[in-house]
Design a protein with these regions (language model features):
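Phosphodiester-processing cores and adjacent nucleic acid-binding clamps
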Residues: 1-442
């Protein structure tokens, strides 16, 4: 049996079209022995963070068990403007686009995919978020491209009988992506005569596949087998059919409504080997793509602007001279009284989460200035001699804010609140949530 992974998968984030939940997909892939999988929702990347997080959770357990990590591949099935320019919004032809599967090969590719999808929504939206050849070429680095389903540019041109145009398109894609461009073949044969399903798709797929295989050989492009997954298990087909009725606003018994083949479930490796028994290389090429893809972290630390602290209070450089990294480590891993220190290993994890020891200098500097302002305000509100209760509460809150990395955020918020009150004449309420009960915020 040839190894195989799914590279064309729609989750429930393909709104009113995909029905599969990410955890169920990943769990099924792992239970079937797959080494990874892609998520390629229609026109969006809404599910990518959930996909990353769930795989990270699963891989944490797998690491403890001594197992290889399961590899997530981040992608999108994009719409490519049919007339070559995503800014065109004039005729019906502009309302959708050719389907194209775009996979991130590495972190650079992921960043480029984000740009492509964002620009498709912001600049190319016309019934669908559309990209175009110009953007694809501009942001091509680090991407792997596949020709998609019958809605793709190559299959559409083949079905229209324009083989030379299909060849030109293949040459264009291959010219940019080289060995990272693949042609897709799909086979959605309905075998149950009692099942109400679309039987025309398979006939079209067979005709298109024959030409694709010929063109692939002629132009030196590898072929991959995919299943255009929209639901997890075979017995989910009827529920998915109901979802399509909701999507198209049609009754179940409407004889004219859209039907899928009901073959679009997340098939096992064995099932895919059965469907493509005569094309083992198309199955094997999916794992070639899997092996090309690098793993990388989607998480990043919050990026906050620096609040300009007056120089007469001090500078960050002075704080660096005044405190050692060990001073800061103790301060950030103990309570507000400098007592009850965390175990070293736990403390190191906390510091790493804040951005590392070097970042602590900035946080400490901002925290001390926030404390300076808080005590200034407290003396105006409560008098020069603060009660122990007020002082303890201020110190406790300031310590919590500091050890969570929030002082800069509080300084920025108080700055625009003061501007709203004192300069712009904007009414400002007491706030909401836990901050409304904070003595420091008060």
């Amino acid at each position: 049996m040839e190894d195989f992974v799914h590279l064309h998968v729609h989750t429930q984030y393909s709104l009113l079209d995909g029905q599969a939940s990410i955890p169920r997909l990943v769990d099924k892939a792992i239970s079937d022995g797959m080494r990874g999988m892609a998520v390629t929702d229609h026109g969006n990347m809404f599910g990518i963070k959930d996909f990353f997080d769930y795989c990270a959770k699963v891989n944490g357990k797998r690491k403890k068990e001594g197992l290889e990590p399961f590899k997530p591949i981040f992608g999108c099935e994009m719409y490519v403007a049919r007339r070559g320019d995503k800014s065109l919004r004039e005729i019906k032809q502009d309302q959708s686009g050719w389907h194209l599967v775009v996979l991130a090969k590495n972190e650079t590719g992921y960043r480029n995919l984000v740009k492509l999808v964002s620009r498709a929504w912001v600049d190319g939206y016309y019934m669908r978020p559309r990209t175009d050849h110009a953007d694809l070429e501009k942001f091509h680095e680090g991407l792997i491209i596949a020709s998609a389903c019958l809605g793709g540019e190559i299959p559409k041109k083949i079905m229209s009988g324009d083989i030379s145009a299909a060849e030109e398109a293949i040459q264009w894609f291959k010219g940019i992506w080289g060995d990272d461009y693949y042609l897709e073949v799909q086979r959605h044969q309905v075998k149950d005569p009692r099942q109400r399903a679309n039987r025309e798709v398979f006939e079209l797929q067979q005709k298109v596949n024959k030409v694709i295989l010929d063109l692939a050989q002629k132009h030196g492009v590898k072929v991959i087998a995919t299943n255009d997954v929209h639901f997890v298990d075979e017995d989910n087909a009827e529920a998915h059919d109901h979802l399509l009725c909701l999507s198209t606003n049609k009754d179940l018994n409407d004889p004219t409504r859209m039907l899928y083949t009901k073959q679009e479930w997340f098939k096992t490796r064995e099932e895919m080997n059965e469907v493509f028994a005569d094309l083992p290389e198309a199955l094997a090429n999916t794992t070639e793509i899997l092996d090309k893809v690098e793993t990388y972290n989607l998480d990043s630390n919050p990026i906050m602007p620096f609040f300009p602290i007056p120089e007469d209070f001090g500078t960050e450089e002075q704080w660096r001279e005044r405190f050692t990294t060990e001073d800061l480590f103790r301060e950030f891993t103990s309570d507000e009284n400098g007592e009850n220190p965390m175990p070293r290993e736990e403390g190191e994890k906390k510091i790493a989460k804040l951005g590392g020891l070097d970042k602590l200098y900035r946080i400490k500097f901002e925290a001390d200035y926030l404390g300076f302002l808080a005590y200034q305000g407290a003396r105006k509100l409560y008098g020069e001699n603060l009660s122990k209760e007020v002082d303890d509460r201020i110190r406790f809150e300031l310590h919590i804010m500091k050890t969570m990395g929030f002082p800069g955020y509080f300084l920025i918020v108080q700055d625009f609140i003061n501007s709203a009150r004192n300069e712009l004449g904007v009414w400002v309420g007491p706030g909401r949530g836990s901050a409304a009960g904070s003595v420091v915020a008060y």
